[in-house]
From Swiss-Prot:
Gene behind this protein: atpF
Membrane spanning residue stretches: 15-35
Listed name of the protein: ATP synthase subunit b
GO CC annotation: plasma membrane-derived thylakoid membrane; proton-transporting ATP synthase complex
Localization in the cell: Cellular thylakoid membrane
GO MF, any single term: proton-transporting ATP synthase activity, rotational mechanism
Subunit relationships: F-type ATPases have 2 components, F(1) - the catalytic core - and F(0) - the membrane proton channel. F(1) has five subunits: alpha(3), beta(3), gamma(1), delta(1), epsilon(1). F(0) has four main subunits: a(1), b(1), b'(1) and c(10-14). The alpha and beta chains form an alternating ring which encloses part of the gamma chain. F(1) is attached to F(0) by a central stalk formed by the gamma and epsilon chains, while a peripheral stalk is formed by the delta, b and b' chains.
Annotated membrane topology: Single-pass membrane protein
General function of this protein: F(1)F(0) ATP synthase produces ATP from ADP in the presence of a proton or sodium gradient. F-type ATPases consist of two structural domains, F(1) containing the extramembraneous catalytic core and F(0) containing the membrane proton channel, linked together by a central stalk and a peripheral stalk. During catalysis, ATP synthesis in the catalytic domain of F(1) is coupled via a rotary mechanism of the central stalk subunits to proton translocation. Component of the F(0) channel, it forms part of the peripheral stalk, linking F(1) to F(0).
Similarity comment text for this entry: Belongs to the ATPase B chain family.
Amino acid sequence: MTLNLNPLETNLVNLVIVIGLLFWFLRGFLGGILERRRAAILQELQDAESRLKTATENLSQAQSELAAAQQKAEKIRADGQARAAGIRAEGEKRTISVMAAIKAGADADAEADAARIKDSLRREAALAAIDKALAVLPARLDASAQAKLIDSTIKNLENA
């Protein structure tokens, strides 16, 4: 073997050897680093997909629960409105009934007062007529008229 002292050829061989060694060494080293990084990225992607799937399922479940809660709230609101309308109608009926009873009571009181006043006026009119008749009677009734009146009254009593 002869020693090659040509620097161009020597550097070229050295460069090929160094590049070959670097390629062989770095391929294993960088390949391992890149493979670990690739595995970590794939694992993170799988975790993200799993979290996305779980979040989607949770969202779907929450939306269905929300829809059910909204339906229940709507039913409760409708029931409340119906109950309020029923209570309002019952209150109106009760108020009308009480007002009718009060009016009937007032009418009965007014009729009773009117009847009492009529009776009182009749009594007063009868008493006034009796007083007037008693005042006028002695002057108009002489002995023969009195005898006629007594005879007529006796006949009426006998016929009765």
